[in-house]
Amino acid sequence: MPLLAGWNADEVRAGVVLAKQKPTSASFIADAKQRFGDQADAVIKAYPAATDAEALESAAALASDTFIGHSTWKWIEMQTQTGGAPVYRYSFDRKIPVAPDAKINGVAATSKDIGARHAGEIEYVFGTLDTIAGVTWEPSDRKLSNEMVTYWSNFARTGDPNGSGLPAWPRYEAATRSVLHLDETIHAAPDTLRPRYEAIDAFVAKQRTP
């Protein structure tokens, strides 16, 4: 059976990993060493934290990957290897517009702060952007929503999301590992984040070893 799967670029925030710790290079590295033990160096290589700014980005990436990115990646990889049917992978990257009064933990937040959050793609896929109160949508959001509705509808009907007028969505295959990036401009590109998922995968595999 064909598979269409993916996740969002900013699923969750750095605090999921660092809790109430200040997001610094030192706190991220200390947390990684505690969390991943003898696999910590490999994880830190995949999620670098040479500066505090880099540590903040890596903490958010690690939080998102351990929440949903790695497990979905693993599913896609196994389906590609054993499923015998086409696989299509996406990354929803659009930093979603927010209402003027949007907040995170009581602090005013912008679209850049919230990013491509968990479940943020749902209104795009179902063409229901206007059900979110207070948001002023850009023409590019409506275009992206229309294209996503068409991709998902095509896939539901035929097992292939591609169709007339849409940017080409290549199959996810071992030789290319193409990912469709859903943003103001849609484009396909090879997966560049694989080392992150492989680092987590190695840690998970070791936990299963007696």
Task: Name each region found by the language model.
Residues 162-189:
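Mature extracytoplasmic/periplasmic domains
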Residues 98, 128-132, 175, 186-188, ...:
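A generic structural micro-environment signature
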Residues 146-162, 166-167:
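K/E-rich alpha-helical interaction surfaces of small helical-bundle regulatory domains
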Residues 116-117, 146, 172-174:
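A structural signal for short secondary-structure junctions
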Residues 91, 173, 179-180, 196-198, ...:
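Small/flexible residues
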Residues 185-210:
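Tryptophan-rich aromatic "cage" segments
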Residues 133-147, 192-195, 199:
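A short, structured beta-strand-centered segment in the mid-to-C-terminal lobe
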